[in-house]
Regions:
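Class I SAM-dependent methyltransferase Rossmann-like catalytic core
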Residues: 1-32
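Class I SAM-dependent methyltransferase SAM/SAH-binding core
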Residues: 24, 28-87
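A short glycine-rich, Lys/Arg-flanked "PGG" loop and its adjoining helix->strand segment in the class I
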Residues: 110-125
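C-terminal lobe and adjacent flexible extensions of AdoMet/dcAdoMet transferase-like proteins
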Residues: 192-245
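Hydrophobic beta-strand segment of the Class I
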Residues: 97-98
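Short alpha-helix
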Residues: 146-174, 206
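Conserved catalytic loop of SAM-dependent methyltransferase domains
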Residues: 168-193, 201-203
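Short, glycine-/aromatic-enriched active-site segment of Class I SAM-dependent methyltransferases
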Residues: 130-147
Length: 245
C-alpha cells in the first residue's frame, strides 16, 4: 500500500465518502490550533487539508515504504519521506500529531509510538486512527484500511500506555460497509448517524485521542532497534519545527 494507491483511493467515490465521514469525526478533536505545531504521520494529508484556516504550522511525514507526494498542492513543500522510527525533529517540538494510515502499516507499532512521543511537547495531543479488528473494513481490500494490522481497543490502550500516552477519549467512524455501490455512499451520513446510535462495536475505524505523559521515573525500558535504519535524504538532520502554510 503506497501513496499512489492511497491517492487513487481518496479520488474514488468510496474514498470521498470516507474522507467526509472521518473528517466530521476528527474536526471536534482537532479544535482550534492557532500557532500549534501539527504533524501528520502516515497518509494524513486528506485530513490535514481540512485543518482550520488559522493553522500556521503543519507538516506531513510519510513513511519510507509508502513513498511521498507533494503537499500542499500550492505553496512551499511541507511533506517529507521519513523513517517512522527516527523522525528528523528535535524533542518536544510537536503540539498535535495526527496518525492516519500509519500505525497499522508499520513493522513495529510500539517503536513508532515511542518516536512520536519523543518529538511531542509535554501534554501534546495524539489523534490516532486505525482499522477496527472487529469491523467490516478490515475484512475487505476495497480500501486501504483492509491492509496491515487492525487493532482492538484493548490492544491500542496497551500500546499507548507502554509508549507513555494517556488515552482521554475514544470514538468510532465508518459505519457503512466498504462497498463501491453509489447508493450506499449517498446515504453514508445517515448510516453513520444510525450506526452511532445503535452500536460502534463493528465500525470500520477506531479513533483515540491521547496525551503525552512525562514521568519523573519510568520502570519500563524504551525499545531500541538493532537493525540498520533507512535514512531518507529529505530532512536528514534534526530540526526545530518552524514551518508554515
Amino acid at each position: 500500500m503506497d501513496v499512489v494507491d492511497l491517492r487513487e483511493f481518496y479520488a474514488s467515490p468510496l474514498g470521498n465518502a470516507t474522507r467526509r465521514l472521518l473528517s466530521a469525526k476528527l474536526k471536534p478533536r482537532l479544535g482550534s490550533l492557532g500557532d500549534a505545531c501539527v504533524m501528520g504521520m502516515g497518509f494524513a494529508t486528506p485530513y490535514l487539508d481540512d485543518l482550520p484556516s488559522e493553522t500556521k504550522r503543519s507538516i506531513a511525514f510519510m513513511m519510507a515504504r509508502q513513498g511521498v507526494i507533494h503537499w500542499p498542492r500550492e505553496g512551499s513543500v511541507q511533506s517529507a519521506l521519513v523513517d517512522e522510527f527516527d523522525l528528523p525533529l528535535l524533542e518536544s517540538t510537536v503540539d498535535l500529531a495526527l496518525v492516519v494510515h500509519g500505525l497499522e502499516l508499520t513493522d513495529s507499532p510500539i517503536e513508532m509510538l515511542q518516536e512520536v512521543w519523543r518529538v511531542m511537547a509535554p501534554q501534546g495531543r495524539l489523534v490516532l486512527v486505525v482499522p477496527n479488528r472487529r469491523g467490516l473494513w478490515d475484512a475487505f481490500d476495497t480500501s486501504p484500511f483492509g491492509y496491515g494490522q487492525p487493532f482492538s481497543r484493548t490492544q491500542l490502550a496497551g500500546l499507548l500506555k507502554e509508549a507513555q500516552f494517556s488515552a482521554v477519549s475514544w470514538s468510532h467512524a465508518l459505519q457503512m460497509p466498504p462497498t463501491k455501490r453509489g447508493f450506499v455512499h449517498s446515504g453514508a451520513s445517515a448510516i453513520e448517524r444510525i450506526g452511532d446510535l445503535i452500536t460502534s462495536r463493528f465500525s470500520g475505524l477506531i479513533i483515540v485521542e491521547a496525551v503525552k505523559q512525562v514521568y519523573a521515573f519510568s520502570s519500563g525500558k524504551r525499545v531500541r532497534r538493532l537493525m540498520p535504519r533507512f535514512k531518507p535524504a529529505l530532512l536528514p538532520s534534526p530540526v526545530r519545527f518552524d514551518g508554515g502554510q
